[in-house]
């Protein structure tokens, strides 16, 4: 059985809006070295395939991020935020049954494509929703449908 997902413009717009918040951030992947051991007073480093998202570049200040957010809000006729809430606490609000899971998986793929980010935390309110998200990732909703459109 092959699943076919209908692409909705508002889902793509939401993913684009999140990515646009970080406009000016270069594409970078980030691996790092880990201290593995000390022998005879010398520290030995070994290349370790560890991953993290590259930090936000200093040029992308909180003021610039807030300006990007306000521009997006104005374009959507949403009251502009007065200040950032925490360090980049972004919310996409959608009605039930309109494809939130698809939208944030699409957003993850877009953030990876634009900025090289590869680590994300998905927080859900219940076990049932977690299992649904897990299943969506298992059937490769993101890979099967996002890659066709990205």
Predicted features by range, described:
Residues 1-149:
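RecA-like P-loop NTPase motor core of helicase/translocase proteins
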């Amino acid at each position: 059985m092959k699943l076919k997902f209908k692409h909705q413009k508002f889902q793509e717009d939401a993913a684009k809006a999140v990515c646009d918040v970080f406009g000016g951030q270069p594409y970078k992947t980030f691996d790092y070295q880990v201290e593995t051991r000390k022998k005879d007073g010398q520290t030995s480093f070994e290349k370790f395939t560890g991953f993290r998202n590259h930090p936000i570049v200093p040029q992308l200040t909180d003021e610039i991020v807030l300006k990007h957010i306000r521009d997006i809000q104005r374009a959507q006729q949403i009251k502009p935020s007065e200040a950032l809430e925490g360090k980049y606490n972004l919310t996409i609000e959608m009605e039930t049954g309109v494809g939130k899971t698809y939208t944030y998986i699409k957003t993850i793929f877009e953030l990876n494509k634009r900025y090289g980010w590869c680590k994300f935390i998905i927080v859900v309110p219940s076990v049932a929703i977690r299992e649904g998200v897990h299943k969506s990732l298992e059937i490769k909703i993101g890979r099967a449908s996002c890659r066709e459109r990205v």
